Amino acid sequence: MAENHPRPRGRPTIPEQVIRQKIHDVTFLLLINQGYNKTTLDEVAKKAGIAKKTLYRFVKNREDLLEQVVMSWEDNFIPDFKKEANNFQQLMKSLKIFLTEIAEKSLSMEAVGLFKLLQSDFPYREILLSKYQQSEIEKSRNILTNWLESQYQKGLLKKMDFYIISELVISMVIAEPLRQMALGILPSLPETDITPRISAAVSLLERE
């Protein structure tokens, strides 16, 4: 005769990482859709379907939560070069792929919403803006600078100030389109075709 095992009572345990991600997702959507003032811990807990005391297991206060959300949004995306370039044509192709990946992340509807939020006036804004710039802009620029330097060492590029070139290239592809998207002049990706800007940016590296 088969044994009847009693079913465990209560809800199944949800992994903490799942809860944390749910909190971050809810907070991010509240921030970009309703702004800072309406992104309260009470509202986050309600939208996430958790008790407020559960929320406090993951965050100290609202400022800590916002910092976590901004940093996790950026840290989830680490652009990189997938293949080694063996000639100048491959170098240019790899660079275009790299810039396309950055643009798809940095010019998405969510990214534009976050950028608009950070341009508004609210408590803790300066600290969040600083962390956003360090995480997003500096990370991409440093990766690109190091990669271009390595291509120079391989003889694929002429000598130039790769730090400034990296800054210029990323600014051409991201900075001005992001400003126009935040103002509503351009739609976010994928509605806007960023390819012409990428082509213009990589032309800075073309050999004479």
Residue ranges and their predicted role:
Residues 67-98, 106, 110:
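Amphipathic alpha-helical linker/stalk segments
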Residues 152-201:
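Hydrophobic/aromatic-rich alpha-helical bundle segments in the mid-to-C-terminal region
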Residues 16, 20, 24, 70, ...:
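Amphipathic, non-transmembrane alpha-helical scaffold segments
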Residues 1-34, 38-47, 58, 63-64:
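Basic, helix-initiating cap at the start of DNA-binding domains
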Residues 53:
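Key DNA-contact positions within bacterial/archaeal DNA-binding proteins
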Residues 109, 113, 117, 126-153, ...:
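Amphipathic alpha-helical packing segments from all-alpha helical-bundle domains
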Residues 93-120, 124, 174-177:
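Helical hydrophobic small-molecule/effector-binding pocket
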